[in-house]
A protein has these predicted regions:
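Helix-start/capping segments and mature chain N-termini
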Residues: 1-178
Length: 178
């Protein structure tokens, strides 16, 4: 059924992912990028929420984009932290933070046009996990990382900012030292 229970933390959402995950690993990848429907809407990567940073095709403005909470993805606590930090710290630098449906075709087009800046997953265990390449329809899409880079600038900043709050280095209402 459309959407299913993708917005719930259920074993039923994880068990069917084991075989595709093993297939991805057999092809040299660490995770699967989950696409939804005939339109191939980008949803999540592995068990993490997925973000892309790119330049808007019409305006050239930098955007941090993630799928909306429409019932198909988990409302991740780290996703919420990334969005909050992006609105607090990236928007004043001219970024636009967007929750909307976007397709794999759109992501591929942005990469081909040199507008894809970076991509990463976010989740409780990893905090952020940079994405180097996406294999789609027989081609390898470069997600903006150079050969010598392990992380893009936004993913690195998000990890740094979240850990600073987790460890009490950045005083914030999210953190309480007991």
């Amino acid at each position: 059924w459309p959407g299913g229970v993708g917005d719930k933390k259920l074993g039923a959402n994880y068990a069917p992912c084991v075989v595709p995950q093993r297939e991805a690993m057999g092809r040299g990848f660490q995770q699967n990028l989950w696409l939804f429907g005939e339109q191939e809407y980008v949803t999540e990567v592995g068990t993490m929420n997925f973000f892309v940073a790119l330049r808007n095709k019409e305006t050239g403005q930098k955007e941090l984009i993630t799928a909306p909470l429409d019932g198909t993805i988990l409302e991740g606590v780290t996703r919420d932290s990334v969005l909050s930090l992006a609105r607090e710290r990236l928007v004043p630098q001219g970024w636009n933070v967007v929750e909307r449906k976007y397709t794999m075709k759109e992501l591929d087009e942005a990469a081909n046009e040199g507008r894809l800046i970076e991509a990463f997953g976010s989740g409780t265990a990893a905090i952020v996990s940079p994405v180097r390449h996406i294999s789609w329809k027989g081609k390898l899409i470069n997600c903006g990382l150079k050969d010598h880079e392990e992380s893009g600038e936004i993913a690195a900043k998000m990890k740094e900012w979240i850990e600073a709050r987790q460890y009490g280095d950045d005083e914030h209402e999210w953190s309480y030292i007991c």
